[in-house]
């Protein structure tokens, strides 16, 4: 086992650029749900939820009467969905997804023709009924479509967005308006180009939040499969670069806007499911990560995003049916039963929910060490440490998990406890050796939480 010693001094801490106060983790961590989302079970993991709310559930076509909360397929959004979620103290974000009115419908352009007035009324009715200023108080934000990308005519999307956003403002000005998925790069199949779709002076006042989706997929051409994913810190994925580019654009062009990552995640299915791959997922040798890696990479992603001037991050997805395909096995639960990631995310929320990111203490190829401080007691600190390494989903040597022994010095206070990343119902303390100046413990690719006595 390798041994590494890391020395820190106060000037080294101050060398890292800090940003304005980060959100508490409880106001940062979110999850993507849907009709069958169980708010009681997933309340253990976070308090922010995002729902895919299809417009074609509400009406048969744009222009039809708007009848919230009951829609044309007889779903009652209050009693069947948002009411249940708010009863468990979830703050809900509504993704008004175009569904069958979107680019998958070859006649989508004609569906929206001459519907500018209806778009305004739809946004107004939605905000007035569901928004925080109304009687029901079921949601606090509305996203105007999910992933229209470059397949949806941009001029048409902008028209829909402007009219719907103005309607939302008229219906409830307290509702935060969120863009569709948009990056500060050229548009692709899943995302719009912030610089073209949302930079116009007429658009900027109509939204409050920039919306990102990012997945740790390899750059094109590295593997046969276009879906191969890697660990969050990997150099062969634009996973974090997408966020950095968007933060930079926001700071320069729209500094008053929040940034939410509304989708990120990892698939992990069972060997039994893998044996049943079919179609392109079999031909191109699609593979997910292991259950342990899913837990590791989700926690590390939350920690990384918290350090990047991002206001929220919603993981995808709440549950899966153990399907061997992209997004088919990305749940925290599998057929309703917790995976290791469920316990890991619940632990992060429980342990650091009242903490906010403070600074990066160390970031090397061998160690990431982040500092978090408690909400109203800034002398209560927690360090989170992990090895920023891992395996790609197409690599088979995944049982050789790396472990090293490290010594940290120049501690801010006396170490109280080290919690190992939780992957089952039981939490585990990690063994460590410490004195007033240093602490030694074993480190792996699973983050650990180093809690200190209050600084005197």
Question: What are the residue ranges of the model-derived segments?
Answer:
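Boundary/entry segment of secreted carbohydrate-active catalytic domains
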Residues: 21-54
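Aromatic-lined carbohydrate-recognition surfaces of secreted/lumenal glycan-active proteins
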Residues: 31, 163-194, 238-270, 310-322
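Substrate-binding cleft and catalytic face of glycoside hydrolase catalytic domains
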Residues: 44-228
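Conserved, mostly hydrophobic/aromatic
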Residues: 49, 126, 142, 164, ...
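Substrate-binding surface in catalytic domains of secreted glycosidases
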Residues: 205, 209, 214-250, 279-292, ...
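Aromatic/acidic polysaccharide-binding cleft in carbohydrate-active enzymes
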Residues: 266-348, 360-365
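Carbohydrate-binding surface patches
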Residues: 363-413
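C-terminal beta-strand-rich structural cap/linker in extracellular carbohydrate-active enzymes
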Residues: 428-456
């Amino acid at each position: 086992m390798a041994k590494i010693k890391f020395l820190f001094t106060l000037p080294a801490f101050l060398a890292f650029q800090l940003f304005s106060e980060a959100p508490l983790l409880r106001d940062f961590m979110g999850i993507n749900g849907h009709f069958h989302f169980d708010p009681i079970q997933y309340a253990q993991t976070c308090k922010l939820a995002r729902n895919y709310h299809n417009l074609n559930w509400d009406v048969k076509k744009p222009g039809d009467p708007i009848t919230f909360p009951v829609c044309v397929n007889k779903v009652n959004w209050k009693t069947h969905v948002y009411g249940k979620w708010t009863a468990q103290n979830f703050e809900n974000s509504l993704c008004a997804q175009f569904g069958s009115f979107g680019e998958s419908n070859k006649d989508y352009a004609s569906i929206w023709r001459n519907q500018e007035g209806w778009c305004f009324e739809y946004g107004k009715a939605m905000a007035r009924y569901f928004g925080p200023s109304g009687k029901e108080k079921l949601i606090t934000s509305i996203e105007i479509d999910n992933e229209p990308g470059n397949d949806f005519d941009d001029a048409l999307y902008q028209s829909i967005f402007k009219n719907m956003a103005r309607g939302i403002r008229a219906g409830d000005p307290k509702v935060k308006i969120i863009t569709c998925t948009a990056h500060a790069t050229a548009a692709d199949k899943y995302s719009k180009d912030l610089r073209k779709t949302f930079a116009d002076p007429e658009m900027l006042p109509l939204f409050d939040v920039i919306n990102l989706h990012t997945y740790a997929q390899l750059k094109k051409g590295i593997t046969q499969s276009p879906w191969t994913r890697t660990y969050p810190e990997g150099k062969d994925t634009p996973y974090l670069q997408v966020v950095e580019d968007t933060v930079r654009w926001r700071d320069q062009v729209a500094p008053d806007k929040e940034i939410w990552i509304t989708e990120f995640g990892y698939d992990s299915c069972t060997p039994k499911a893998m044996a049943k791959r079919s179609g392109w997922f079999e031909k191109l040798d699609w593979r997910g990560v292991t259950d342990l890696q899913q837990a590791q990479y989700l926690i590390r992603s939350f920690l990384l995003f918290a350090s990047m001037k991002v206001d929220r991050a919603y993981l995808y997805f709440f549950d899966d049916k153990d399907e061997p395909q992209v997004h088919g096995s990305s749940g925290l639960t599998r057929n309703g039963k917790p995976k290791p990631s469920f316990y890991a995310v619940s632990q992060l929320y429980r342990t650091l929910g009242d903490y906010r990111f403070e600074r990066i203490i160390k970031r090397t190829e061998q160690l990431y060490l982040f500092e978090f401080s408690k909400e109203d007691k800034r002398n209560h600190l927690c360090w989170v440490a992990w090895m920023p390494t891992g395996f790609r989903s197409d690599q088979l040597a995944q049982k050789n998990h790396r472990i090293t022994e490290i010594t940290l010095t120049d501690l801010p206070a006396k170490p109280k406890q080290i919690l190992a990343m939780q992957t089952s119902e039981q939490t585990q303390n990690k063994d460590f050796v410490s004195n007033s100046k240093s602490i030694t413990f074993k480190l792996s690719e699973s983050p650990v939480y180093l809690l200190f006595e209050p600084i005197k």
